[in-house]
Design a protein with these regions (language model features):
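Helicase motor core with emphasis on the C-terminal RecA-like subdomain
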Residues: 1-124, 131-134, 161, 169
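C-terminal accessory/connector segments of nucleic-acid motor ATPases
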Residues: 31, 115, 121-194
Length: 194
C-alpha cells in the first residue's frame, strides 16, 4: 500500500509512538495520535491526516470517531483489538470510497497471554472477568477461523452471508484441513495400553 492512506491501531501510547517512529525511519509518512497529546495537537494531526494523501496514522482507539476519509486503503491492528465490536468498527474505516481495501491483524501467543493476565489481575468483579475472557475467546475464534472471515464476522452479529465472500485471506488461500481422527485414535489406544 505504498503511498496509500492507512491506519495502524495500537493498544498503548508508547506503541503508537514506537510504530510511528519505525515507519518514519523507513521513509513512510506516519503520524502518531493518542489521548496523551494536547487536544489542539490531536486536532491538527487529525486535520492533516484528512487533508493530505498517503499518510499513515498510528493511533490508539482515541482516533477514528468522526473521521471521514473515504480513501483509507488499509487498517492494521498492531495488537489484538478490545472486542469484535471494536474490530468491526475500526476496520470499517477502510475503503469507504468503494475501492478495495484491506484489514490486517497482527498478534501472537504472547499477546493472548498478556491479555488474559491483564484480565485476571484487574480489580474487576469475577463476573466481569468471566465476560472479558468470553469476549477474548470470541475474538480469537474469529481471527483463527479456517472459514470465510466475512461470514464469521457477520454471523457474530446475527447476520448471514449465503456464500463465502471470495475476498478474505481464508477464501483466497483456504486453510488445508486434515482429518486427525486416526492419529487421535492411535494416541488414545497407546495411552490405554501404557
Amino acid at each position: 500500500h505504498k503511498g496509500a492512506a492507512g491506519i495502524v491501531y495500537c493498544r498503548s501510547r508508547k506503541r503508537v509512538e514506537d510504530v510511528a517512529a519505525a515507519l518514519q525511519a523507513e521513509g513512510i509518512p506516519a503520524l502518531a495520535y493518542h489521548a496523551g497529546m494536547p487536544s489542539d495537537q490531536r486536532d491538527a494531526i487529525q486535520d492533516r491526516f484528512i487533508a493530505e494523501d498517503g499518510l499513515v496514522m498510528c493511533a490508539t482507539i482515541a482516533f477514528g470517531m468522526g473521521v471521514d476519509k473515504p480513501d483509507i486503503r488499509f487498517v492494521c491492528h498492531h495488537d489484538l483489538p478490545g472486542s469484535i465490536e471494536s474490530y468491526y468498527q475500526e476496520i470499517g474505516r477502510a475503503g469507504r470510497d468503494g475501492d478495495p481495501a484491506e484489514a490486517l491483524l497482527l498478534y501472537g501467543t504472547d499477546d493472548i497471554k498478556l491479555r488474559r493476565e491483564l484480565i485476571e489481575t484487574s480489580e474487576k468483579a469475577p463476573e466481569q472477568k468471566r465476560i472479558e475472557h468470553q469476549r477474548l475467546n470470541q475474538l480469537l475464534a474469529l481471527v483463527e477461523t479456517p472459514d470465510c472471515r466475512r461470514q464469521a464476522l457477520l454471523a457474530y452479529f446475527g447476520e448471514r452471508l449465503g456464500e463465502p465472500c471470495g475476498n478474505c485471506d481464508r477464501c483466497l488461500t483456504p486453510v488445508e484441513r486434515q482429518d486427525g481422527s486416526v492419529a487421535a485414535q492411535k494416541f488414545l489406544s497407546a495411552m490405554v495400553r501404557t
